[in-house]
């Protein structure tokens, strides 16, 4: 099977929401909230939602946000979140390709680093991210849920 990686466009909202149900089905946004957030994301040049599309089906996605910065010679940094692959399409390299493209976008944006957060603690997921070039030794993440 072959797939393509592209930035999500206005018409991809329903596909993204469907994919996100595999991340957090319990807190899906209302249609109004989703539409408002989608409009804000689409108008922000620093926010990239990448899609992995296989045979016309949006099978995987991740979000990359480039953050302007006043340290590190004013070079921005980037965050990757919401990495998800439809269960029927796992193990085909989609997520690896998405992460590779996200890192390329960060590099093209002049970022000095890209960070990735995951809520998964299982070895398979953590080893997947390590295999994609990320490490868990350089930084310690803390989260305060609001």
Where are these regions (language model features)?
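Conserved N-terminal entry element of GNAT/NAT acetyltransferase domains
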Residues: 1-11
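Conserved GNAT acetyl-CoA-binding A-motif
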Residues: 106-118
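Conserved active-site alpha-helix within GNAT-family acetyltransferase domains
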Residues: 96, 108, 120-138
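A short helix-loop-beta-strand connector motif used in the catalytic cores of GNAT acetyltransferases and
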Residues: 39-51, 79
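Conserved GNAT-fold acetyl-CoA-binding loop/helix
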Residues: 17-39
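Conserved acetyl-CoA-binding loop-helix of GNAT-fold acetyltransferases
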Residues: 91-104, 131
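A conserved beta-turn-beta hairpin within the catalytic core of GNAT-like acetyltransferases
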Residues: 69-80, 90
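Conserved beta-strand in the GNAT
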Residues: 51, 57-66, 79, 84
């Amino acid at each position: 099977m072959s797939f393509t990686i592209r930035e999500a466009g206005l018409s991809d909202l329903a596909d993204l929401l469907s994919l996100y149900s595999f991340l957090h089905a319990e807190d899906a946004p209302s249609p109004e909230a989703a539409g408002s957030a989608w409009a804000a994301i689409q108008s922000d040049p620093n926010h990239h939602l990448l899609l992995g599309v296989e045979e016309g089906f949006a099978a995987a996605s991740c979000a990359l946000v480039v953050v302007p910065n006043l340290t590190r010679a004013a070079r921005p940094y980037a965050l990757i979140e919401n990495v998800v692959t439809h269960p029927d399409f796992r193990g085909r390299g989609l997520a690896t390709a998405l992460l590779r493209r996200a890192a390329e976008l960060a590099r093209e944006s002049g970022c000095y680093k890209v960070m990735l957060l995951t809520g998964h603690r299982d070895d398979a997921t953590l080893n997947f991210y390590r295999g994609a070039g990320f490490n868990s030794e350089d930084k310690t993440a803390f989260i305060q849920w609001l």
